[in-house]
Curated annotation (Swiss-Prot):
HAMAP family reported for this sequence: PSII_PsbN (MF_00293)
Keywords, in A-Z order: Chloroplast, Membrane, Plastid, Thylakoid, Transmembrane, Transmembrane helix
Protein name in UniProt: Protein PsbN
Chief place of localization: plastid
Membership in a protein family: Belongs to the PsbN family.
Organism: Tetradesmus obliquus
Amino acid sequence: MDSPAFFFTFFLWFLLLSATGYSIYVSFGPPSKKLRDPFEEHED
C-alpha cells in the first residue's frame, strides 16, 4: 500500500468520478436550466 502507483491510481479514479459526477450534475441538475438548446434557437 505504500507504492506510488497505488496513490496515483486512486487519484486518477477520484478525478474521473468527480468529473463524471459534476457533468451529470450540470446536465440534469439545477444548473441545466441555464443551458441553451441550439436546436430550439435555429428554425428551418
